[in-house]
Amino acid sequence: MKCPSCHHNGTRVLDSRPADEGRSIRRRRECERCHFRFTTFERVEETPLIVVKKEGTREEFSREKILRGLIKACEKRPVALEQLEEVTQQIERELRNSGINEVKSETIGEMVMEQLSKIDEVAYVRFASVYRQFKDLNVFIEELKELIKKEQGERA
């Protein structure tokens, strides 16, 4: 591996350890010429996951987009950023483990709503109102009734 400081090809590994819950390996390296120390990460190259949008366009999956949507929905709510990152990671892991290379944006939206309903009901309603594009108050009220019915069913 080339040294990022002097661009010499000779480096040696000083330390290796698992990182990112075992999905990558962190290596501490040192250049044989200038003795500059740096860290590299080795991970399996994943096949791209493609999201098929409602209008039929395709784009590469972006975990950042999911996280931004979660953060927006949970704005001024008592939800930790770590919890939202965990949800994002869980959704991505579930999609990648499914073995499919293309996923509909609707599927991702439903997964996000399912997770939000477990975390914070207000955030769930916020996300659902944007995601489902409620046209009027009656549709919004119906969604709230479904949420209440679901919550009462879980308590029973």
From Swiss-Prot:
Molecular functions per Gene Ontology: ATP binding; DNA binding; zinc ion binding
| Domain annotation ATP-cone: ranges | 49-139
Q: Needs which cofactor? A: Zn(2+)
- The record places its unnamed zinc fingers at 3-34
Q: Which Pfam families does this entry report, sorted A to Z?
A: ATP-cone, Zn_ribbon_NrdR
Cofactor info, note text: Binds 1 zinc ion.
Matches recorded under InterPro entries? ATP-cone_dom (IPR005144), NrdR-like_N (IPR055173), RNR_NrdR-like (IPR003796)
Q: For the region Disordered, what residue ranges are annotated? A: 1-21
Q: Name one GO biological process term.
A: negative regulation of DNA-templated transcription
Which keywords appear in this protein's UniProt record, sorted alphabetically? Answer: ATP-binding, DNA-binding, Metal-binding, Nucleotide-binding, Repressor, Transcription, Transcription regulation, Zinc, Zinc-finger
Report whether Phosphoprotein shows up as a keyword of the record. no
In its keyword annotation, does this UniProt entry include Metal-binding? Answer: yes
Family named by the database record: Belongs to the NrdR family.
Give the protein's biological function.
Negatively regulates transcription of bacterial ribonucleotide reductase nrd genes and operons by binding to NrdR-boxes.
State the protein's name: Transcriptional repressor NrdR
Lineage of source species = Bacteria, Bacillati, Bacillota, Bacilli, Bacillales
